[in-house]
């Protein structure tokens, strides 16, 4: 938690990596990376690991400590704020993906959004733990907002990322270039020609998967085993 950035530009962000030099921890918040940008997913793991530790060890005093609770609020300030995006996903800029930066995964890559879902759920558990010991109206408001965000995020992922043989058939028949009130039929203006020809035969009728990314006009239909595995683990 001492590595969490407190500067205005990157407040709440965790470094992609850090090194030890002469007894001091030197964190990389993007100043050493290509594009000079830190990884979005690097900041989302610690609440998950923190809650798992508290749950397994029973060390509630650590979960309710001022340092942990402050870290939770800094992270939520970073994630739950007004943006130009009307969706509950976390926008990931180009080069801001710790797992594999050159794979064209900017936008809303599955691994990051699933990890965001787990991160917010863990933050809720840690805040509820704190609320048992100390009442706060601000904390109650943050809990309501975070729960709603988790719900909206899961619904968004199931609606736009989950594909089966049946949904592919529907997607190919949807109208494109829609505007106004009818846009809900094809919100991201997915063109039939961008759907891979092999996808229908590969899916058959046995199941489905979460696609790699959803972007206007050009979803990423690649299958990412890590993102789908995390979705199963985290209850998406």
Q: Where are the language model's segments positioned?
A:
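Aromatic-rich carbohydrate-recognition surfaces in CAZymes
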Residues: 1-86, 110-117, 221, 225
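Catalytic cores of carbohydrate-active enzymes
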Residues: 9-11, 93, 106, 115-236
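Acidic/His metal-coordination segments adjacent to aromatic residues that form catalytic metal sites
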Residues: 16-37, 92-109, 202-217
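Generic alpha-helix signal with a bias toward terminal, lower-confidence helices
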Residues: 26, 30, 52, 91, ...
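A generic structural signal for short coil/turn motifs at secondary-structure boundaries
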Residues: 62-63, 100-103, 134-137
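Short alpha-helical interface elements
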Residues: 71, 78, 100-104, 175-182
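C-terminal ends of transmembrane alpha-helices
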Residues: 84-94
């Amino acid at each position: 938690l001492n590595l969490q950035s407190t500067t205005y530009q990157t407040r709440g962000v965790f470094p992609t990596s850090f090194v030890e030099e002469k007894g001091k921890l030197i964190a990389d918040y993007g100043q050493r990376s290509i594009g000079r940008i830190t990884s979005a997913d690097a900041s989302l793991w610690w609440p998950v690991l923190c809650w798992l530790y508290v749950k397994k060890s029973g060390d509630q005093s650590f979960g309710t400590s001022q340092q942990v609770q402050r870290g939770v609020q800094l992270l939520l300030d970073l994630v739950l704020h007004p943006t130009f995006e009307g969706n509950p996903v976390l926008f990931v800029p180009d080069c801001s993906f710790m797992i594999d930066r050159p794979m064209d995964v900017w936008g809303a890559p599955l691994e990051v959004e699933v990890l965001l879902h787990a991160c917010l759920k863990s933050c809720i558990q840690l805040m509820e733990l704190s609320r048992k010991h100390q009442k706060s109206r601000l904390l109650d408001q943050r809990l309501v907002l975070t729960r709603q965000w988790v719900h909206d995020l899961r619904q968004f992922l199931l609606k736009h990322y989950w594909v089966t043989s049946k949904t592919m058939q529907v997607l190919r028949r949807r109208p494109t270039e829609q505007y106004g009130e009818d846009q809900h039929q094809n919100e991201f203006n997915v063109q039939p020609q961008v759907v891979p020809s092999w996808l229908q035969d590969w899916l058959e009728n046995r199941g489905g998967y979460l696609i790699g990314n959803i972007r206007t006009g050009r979803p990423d239909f690649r299958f990412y085993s890590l993102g789908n595995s995390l979705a199963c683990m985290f209850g998406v």
